Every structure is written in C-alpha cells, then in structure tokens.
Regions:
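Non-catalytic structural scaffold of enzyme domains
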Residues: 1-127
Length: 127
C-alpha cells in the first residue's frame, strides 16, 4: 500500500482531504501531520520564518522516516518552506497548488488568484 503524508497548517481541511482520499485514492494510506501554529506565525510575520522552515524540515524528515511515497504540503502559505524541505528529503514533495498553477500556465497568459488567506497570495503567485 502506498503512503502519503500530508502536512497541514490547520485542521480545517482535514476531514475534506480524508474524504477525498477515501473516495479517489482508497488504496493510499493518508498520514496527517498538523501544526496549526505555522499559519499563525506566517500571518504574524508576513511570510515564512527560520522557525517555520525548521519545523517543516522536521515534519518532512518525520514523514520520510514513516516510509511515505509522497509528502503533500497542504498549505500554500508555507509553500516557500516546502521548497526547502524538498532539498532535505529523498521522497517527492508536492505543494497542493502546484498542479493547478501548472495547468493555469498551460491554459492562459492572464491568471487570477483567489485565496482564503492573504498569506497565500505571494507563494501562490510565485509558482
């Protein structure tokens, strides 16, 4: 059975993602790592901090030690730290908004971004 570790910055989308995994990827074991202090720290500091990067790297290492096949970064606001985590793990890491951004670039030249949290805008636009 394949395993995916999801790094969350809030429990808000946990149940929805669990339901999607169960429906679309029933053969994949979903492991959840939740640190709701990450998003608050991003908001307070208008971006990622060394502490966020450090914790994200620890979570990436923990996920890898669990033998996951993929790490999914669920929060765009910490996307820049996920880029650093990618350099510290051997398993693939996917930012949740990467496939959407890649598809948007293929479809058009003017791309609008709508976000539920202001701290998402910069990392999402930088994709």
């Amino acid at each position: 059975m394949q395993k995916v570790a999801v790094i969350h910055t809030s429990p808000v989308s946990l149940n929805e993602l669990k339901a999607l995994f169960a429906e679309l990827l029933p053969e994949v074991e979903m492991i959840n790592i939740i640190d709701d202090s990450l998003l608050e720290e991003v908001k307070r500091n208008n971006g990622i901090t060394p502490g966020i990067v450090s914790r994200m790297c620890l979570y990436g290492q923990a996920a890898q030690s669990m033998g996951v096949d993929l790490i999914l970064n669920q929060c765009s606001s910490v996307g820049e730290s996920a880029d650093i985590v990618k350099q510290t793990v051997t398993c693939p890491l996917l930012k949740i908004d990467e496939p959407m951004a890649e598809e948007a670039v293929q479809l058009g030249t003017k791309i609008g971004v709508i976000a539920t949290v202001g701290s998402t805008m910069k990392p999402s636009c930088n994709l």
